[in-house]
Amino acid sequence: KAIRRQRQMCIRDRFKNYSKLVLNNQESLWEIAFEPNNGQKDNAGYWATYNGPLVDAPDAGSGAANQTHMGRANAFFIVLPYWGHFYEDNDVRRDVNFVDYVYRWVKKDQDQVKMTVCQEISKNMYRYPGKWRREWMAPGFVDPNHTGVNYCPLRYADVVLMAAEAYNETGNTPEAWRLLNSVRTRSEATAITSANYASLMKAPKVYDLPFISDGDEAGKFRTALYWERAFETAYEGQRKFDLIRWGILGDALRAAQAYIENWEEGAAEFKDVDKNGKPTKLEDGATPAVWDPVVWATQNYVAGHNFVDGKHELLPIPLAEIQSNAQLNGENNPGYE
């Protein structure tokens, strides 16, 4: 029924509505509610603080009124900078899903000032999830760390892509493509066809997926769905469960790891970062910019190298639960025996 009611709402407006506390908006099929109480701790959440662009709280000694400024966003989650290059330039989801700026408290201005070139961004080429933002909320807060923004675990586009996947796996791949492309085109991305499939879904636009065979039309759809669910539901808590459901979590982590370790950033985008990843141009612009292209990832990421297939898809069951639940027969999840 939801699929028959295609919603044509700009993705920026859809996620602005969440931040503005517009409850059960057109995109939502189910929301987990938090108290819209200006960020008081009781029954509040962390959407747009943990997973939004960085925002400094007003200086406590400045006399700035909380009711005229944004609350703090701690920005504990960052985005790998190459991810934005996988989107088409015309895909409006790209600039909604992640941002490259912060709001710093500037004492002389007595205000939170938007900065796109600052140490916090440049030193690690930080990018932040952008679907939930303090700047989209009404000014004012009580507790700087909390918001009343609801979490939507099930929304329209997610269901359309679920239906598309089901059609493909039951032999109706043309209908699967129609539904997947309806999600793409409502965000102004190009519909995938046999003529443009390789240019949109294969290297060098994205990296290739050797663990998904795309020798037939159903396989091409699975490859497209791999990327499309990532583009559409980025940072919504869906990805791990998609990869587990498809049986490719380990493969996907290793493929991403290999790409990270061999990716060279473009001079135009990271001209203010030296070969060690340190900023050469700070907020005041006093230090001249010197750029030397290097491989961005210089450290091993645990998930990419240490993931064990058949084990790490699940967490271990705590011993106390095994001992107290006779139905478990003393058994733990695979790999934790």
Regions inferred by a protein language model and the residue ranges of each:
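Acidic-aromatic pocket-rim loops
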Residues: N38-T68, I78, K205, E236
